[in-house]
Swiss-Prot record:
Superkingdom assignment: Eukaryota
SUPFAM superfamilies, per database record: RNI-like
InterPro entries in alphabetical order: Leu-rich_rpt (IPR001611), Leu-rich_rpt_Cys-con_subtyp (IPR006553), LRR_dom_sf (IPR032675)
Domain F-box: 8-56
Pfam families: LRR_6
UniProt protein name: F-box protein At3g58530
Amino acid sequence: MEAKKVTEEEEETWRREIVTSVMRLVSTRLPQTDLISLLLVSPWLYRTLISYPSIWLTINLREMTNAGDRLLAALSLPRYRQVKHINLEFAQGVVDSHLKLVKTECPDALLSLEWLNLNVCQKISDNGIEAITSICPKLKVFSIYWNVRVTDAGIRNLVKNCRHITDLNLSGCKSLTDKSMQLVAESYPDLESLNITRCVKITDDGLLQVLQKCFSLQTLNLYALSGFTDKAYMKISLLADLRFLDICGAQNISDEGIGHIAKCNKLESLNLTWCVRITDAGVNTIANSCTSLEFLSLFGIVGVTDRCLETLSQTCSTTLTTLDVNGCTGIKRRSREELLQMFPRLTCFKVHS
């Protein structure tokens, strides 16, 4: 009888200490869907998991259906009161009315939110942005990729409600104009990352607003914006901490503009795909100044030759891991073997398919 009691006590100790410790470790590595499933296994496991607030800091509804209703249901639960990340990317069934209900029914639920992804939630408009951002005072990262309903009014609401944004993705928001860039520039001097890919209504003047005020930028994505000119590109030189720059499709940039970009000597990733006016002179300037480059795409630039690669090999051979010279008809030494002779650390030779 005594032995049986000892065994039961050992089992209880094992359950309370060992299993609890294991669950604490394992739970931090499980997808949210698995965590929710584990809640249903037993009351003890439910209580154990609920007692770990650090595993309930994210609500991930990516690609889910009925996402608006799911979001409301999640935010009504006490375990999500300290949520910091919400991912609604490609989610279906989330509209302005859901975000307005979050504001009215769960006004304190997002006080700790720092990261909000609304990518491709195309039924959300300026009104939805106003509702959700009005209760997210600590928001730092906001992404609303490919939403054509968002206008300058939505960005006005964002900058009014969220004063601490450091990472902003507006890629594909084609209705935005220079006014949005003015609002961003005036409100976010500490902005570190900005993506305005395919925001085709933004002109040199709008970009200049950002470049002349957001000096902390480390990542700048200007992909598929062919309307900018050297007038704006030259001011990129003001971004002393810039690490990533994508100007794919910048048909108006010249070697002079590239020369100013080369002053950003901390650059690690530079996409010059289809920058068709660039010649060896521009690439040589980059090579001589940006000696930490790890990624460089010259795809489709017919004005560059083997000479620029020779210069690059003298300054960036120990850093470059990705180099795309496909479509550069002036470069003759572009086989895999020849490129590896000049850049032995290359692991990727093709960025564009």
